[in-house]
Amino acid sequence: KPNIILILADDLGYGDLGCFGQKQLKTPRLDAMAKAGMKFTQFYAGCTVCAPSRSVLLTGRHMGRTVVRGNSTAPIVIQPHQSTLASVLKGAGYQTACIGKWGVGTPDNFTNPNDVGFHHFFGYINMWHAHNFYPEFLIRNGKVVKLQNEVAQRWKAFQDPKQPMAGRGVAVKRSEYAPDLFIEDSLAFIRQNQKHPFFLY
């Protein structure tokens, strides 16, 4: 079974990568992955904003039939009984991980990625959280992981993980850069699964 690494980047246009003709910006690592792997040349975003677009990708449902219809603070998420790309691959013997931005609605618990097929999750739980590269916390498999970063005082109310816009803010103390933590976690997941097929999203 082939390993699958699916990179979903918000606001990344078709022509932004070298492998699709970009001449000014250099994207050598992504270009190499595309050359060694598979390129999709006829694909549309499920929606114009991130949460429903991610829901459509993961569930395979048309935008009109997914429960996540927009970016909202309401606790609307993919339900645990809903089939997802991760749950199907998990059932086929894959080790599955979501590392980075979950951003599929606003869960009222932090196990939503794990509940819908991911063995492992480490990252931002919602879109507001993901707007800060130096958050005060991240989520790992349903648990809050405190970081050494600190947001400005005006954003302190949003650092309660149970707040609907949890994680929102601008850091004034910047010690741990979240994308670096995601890279480290991704590499560890790949190393741990050398002998198993894996799906890394």
List the predicted regions and their residue ranges.
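Formylglycine-dependent sulfatase
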Residues: 1-201
